[in-house]
Structures are given as C-alpha cells and as structure tokens.
Regions:
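Class I SAM-dependent methyltransferase SAM/SAH-binding core
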Residues: 55-59, 63-114
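A short acidic, Gly/Pro-enriched loop at the edge of an enzyme's catalytic core
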Residues: 113-124
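A short glycine-rich, Lys/Arg-flanked "PGG" loop and its adjoining helix->strand segment in the class I
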Residues: 138-150
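Conserved alpha-helix/loop element of class I SAM-dependent methyltransferases that forms part
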Residues: 24-27, 34-55, 69
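N-terminal auxiliary segments of SAM/dcSAM-dependent transferases
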Residues: 1-16
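Hydrophobic beta-strand segment of the Class I
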Residues: 25, 125-126
Length: 225
C-alpha cells in the first residue's frame, strides 16, 4: 500500500511522507508509543551488543535513534545509517552532532533496495520499524544479505498485528482512530498517520515474513513475537 493517492510509486511516496513529518517525528513517535519505543530500541541494542560487532549498518535509520544508541553503548563500533529521507537524516545529523557522535555515526542518503555498501562488509545490519516501508521487501532483504559478512547477523524490529482478540481490538481502536487524529493534528499530515497503522495491517504475518527471510538466504536463530 502507499501513503498517498498519487501516481508515484511507494518508495517515492514514503520518501515524501517522511520528509513532511520529520520535524515532528521524534516527539510524536515517543508520545504516541507512550515512550515504549525507547524500551524496544534498548532491547535491540542489548542484542546487538552481545554480537560484538565492529561495523554496523542501520537501514531506514530515520532520525537516528537506534544508530546513536548503538554507538553510545558500544565503544569502538562504527555505525553507518542509511535512509531515503533527507529531512529525517537532517534530524539525525543534528542529534549526532549534539551528542558528539558525528564521527562514529556516518549518515547517508540511500535506498535499502540498492545499498551503496560493499559486499560482505558489515558485521550486523539493523532495521527498526522500516522493513514494512520497503518498496520491494524481497529486494531489500536480499540487499541486506549481500552486505553482511559470512556469519553476520540481521536484527529487525517491526510491528505486527496482535494475535490476542481483545488486545487486537484495543490496538485497532488506538492505531486506526486515535493515532491518526493526534498524529495528523500535530504533524499536519493525517494521511501519514493513517498509512503507518495500515502498513502494519498489510505487512506479512510473522510466519510469512520469516519464510521471506529464509528465501533471501537468512538462517533464523532468534524470533520474539
């Protein structure tokens, strides 16, 4: 699905959407998740830290929250953050400079489906809340597999529709009614905050996504739903 009702392809619409909402993105992200998104990212950092990487690629880095958190918690690690949206990257660069991490976190404009990263050159690839925005999910997963060193790891943090019927009903009410209303009011782009929960609904179920990862060449070792 696409964020807007235009003839542009999904990738261009996603780029445009995040360029529009970038100034309010962090504030809305933390507020609308009740700060839980920070806990999820910390969990990812703990997982990645145990892998003892030297070079990390953070795909769909956005405003850089995960990339900066990894650099902050892992000394000596180089983090490359890639994103389609220049405005999101501008926010990330501002934050990297503010916390003195602009030399260890390299932020670049780029496409997850055509990464300008050498084959077998990174130890870990992370993607936080980004794979469902790929224009071609299979192509993006194959690119991630291409840039990983032999034995490298990918850590993906993503939403899925709750399985518990009661929780699913509450989630549906919040994500499809309240989230677009609040997000649209603050960001001035209601369509963006209608797309975000709808994109979760349309994302492949965990079992299907795992099958896609296997098809792209990954061996799954840890799954938490």
């Amino acid at each position: 699905m696409k964020p807007y009702d235009t003839e542009q392809d999904k990738k261009e619409q996603v780029r445009e959407m995040f360029d529009r909402i970038a100034p309010a993105y962090d504030r809305l992200n933390h507020t609308l998740s009740f700060q839980i998104d920070k806990l999820w990212r910390r969990h990812v950092v703990r997982i990645v830290r145990r892998m003892q990487p030297r070079r990390i690629l953070d795909v769909a880095t956005g405003t850089g929250d995960l990339a900066l958190a990894m650099a902050r918690r892992m000394r000596g690690v180089q983090v490359l953050g890639v994103d389609l949206s220049e405005n999101m990257l501008a926010e990330a660069r501002r934050k990297a400079t503010a916390c003195g991490l602009d030399e260890r976190v390299v932020l670049s404009l780029g496409d997850a489906e055509r990464l300008e990263v050498a084959d077998a050159s990174v130890d870990v690839v992370t993607v936080a809340f980004g794979v469902r925005n790929f224009g071609d999910l299979g192509a993006g997963l194959r690119e991630i597999a291409r840039v990983l060193k032999p034995g490298g790891k990918v850590v993906i943090l993503e939403f899925s529709t709750p399985r518990n019927p009661l929780f699913r009903r509450v989630y549906g009410l919040y994500s499809h009614r309240l989230l677009p209303a609040i997000g649209g009011m603050i960001s001035k782009d209601r369509k963006a905050y209608e797309y975000l929960p709808a994109s979760v609904d349309e994302f492949p179920a965990p079992e299907c996504f795992m099958a896609m990862m296997r098809e792209a060449g990954f061996k799954l070792s840890l799954i938490h739903i």
